Amino acid sequence: LENALNYAVQEHHVAARSVGIVMEVNTGAVLAMATTPAYDPNQPRVIADKAARAAVDALSGKERATALQLAQQTQWRNKAVSDLYEPGSVFKLITCAAALDAGAITRRSTFYCGDSISVAGTRFHCANHKRHGSQTVTQALENSCNQSFIQIGARLGKEAFCDYFAAFGLREPT
């Protein structure tokens, strides 16, 4: 898992830390968990992340001490279980799989991402406020495009969405 995670981080130019979890699909038991960059528990005070280490080394005095402490605490934290995440971007994979399976979309379907999209009087933007323009399902996933996934969810419909929610076992305790 660590090797696959390191490869994915390098291949996709991930700037922040990343996390991977492998679970037993029938029981939900955690089989493996990894975060990158990892640190050497035999040298826990050595900052493993090269960029973080360079940023700390560029400082001096109290600023350096504060930055060093923050960098150490960041690398020690198990991101998989300690950080909070909004479920939206993670759930985009489930929304996509459900819509493809239901025939609500195909791999060739396209979606438009402009300034914003309105749902029930609330305007939604992409998290980085980029306008992706016309994009395929694959591009919408790559961009984690909020507007495209609002459109995909609308095509799927709320009843089918709820049915797939149950089909994926998301109403069952883990």
Regions found by a protein language model. Name each.
Residues 18-90, 94-174:
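Beta-lactam-recognizing serine transpeptidase/beta-lactamase-like catalytic domain environment
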Residues 2-18:
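Conserved, well-ordered alpha-helix/loop/beta-strand core segments that scaffold catalytic motifs
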